[in-house]
């Protein structure tokens, strides 16, 4: 499973409508041991996270929620996750700017070192529809 987006995925994100905040749903599965002797996969990811959170906040974004993934209720139980994180950015452009910065790319090495697999889903708000509101 890929740890980074492929070119087509990155281009699709860049070309998507960018008129509202975007929330990134992160599903994270850590390696038992990080590559390169960085301790556990979670330790390596925490090194990435310290830099990434600061960069998110510099762009007007925020971590909305983070928690342990306790149980797969629906789906393949072999596809378990260790952590779920929701990060909101004011726009897709803010996210794309962040991930193209040299400091981010350097920190991303720790992310790659610590993750066994991940899913990153770009989401836009639809709560008004769930409440029976407009479109």
List the model feature ranges, each with a label.
Residues 1-82, 90-94, 124-135:
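Short S/T/G/P-rich N-terminal loop/turn motif that feeds into the first structured element of a domain
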Residues 86-88, 93-135:
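Short, Lys/Arg-rich amphipathic alpha-helical interaction segments
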